[in-house]
Curated annotation (Swiss-Prot):
GO terms for cellular component: extracellular region. Expressed by the venom duct. Belongs to the conotoxin O2 superfamily. Keywords: Disulfide bond, Ion channel impairing toxin, Knottin, Secreted, Signal, Toxin. It is found in: Secreted. Inhibits voltage-gated ion channels. This is Conotoxin Vc6.10. Residues 1-19 form the signal peptide. The keyword Signal applies. Its main location: secreted. Residues 20-40 form a propeptide. The presence of a 'disulfide through disulfide knot' structurally defines this protein as a knottin.
Length: 70
């Protein structure tokens, strides 16, 4: 039982040490998520107003008559 307790303590110390060393990885992960989700916000969905500065998503077309995505 005593060996198990020591083993668990060593595992906890190693895990926390690894978390401290990899502390900057969270920021890189957030930047990657922001980059990937940014493209979703730049295009417009169905029936949304569209223009050259605010294009429709690739599966929609901007109507020249209504300036809306369809």
């Amino acid at each position: 039982m005593e060996k198990l307790t020591i083993l668990l303590l060593v595992a906890a110390v190693l895990t926390s040490t690894q978390a401290l060393i990899q502390g900057g990885a969270d920021e890189r992960q957030k930047a990657k998520i922001n980059f990937l989700s940014r493209s979703d916000r730049e295009c417009r969905g169905y029936n949304a107003p569209c223009s050259a500065g605010a294009p429709c998503c690739s599966w929609w077309t901007c109507s020249t008559q209504t300036s809306r995505c369809f």
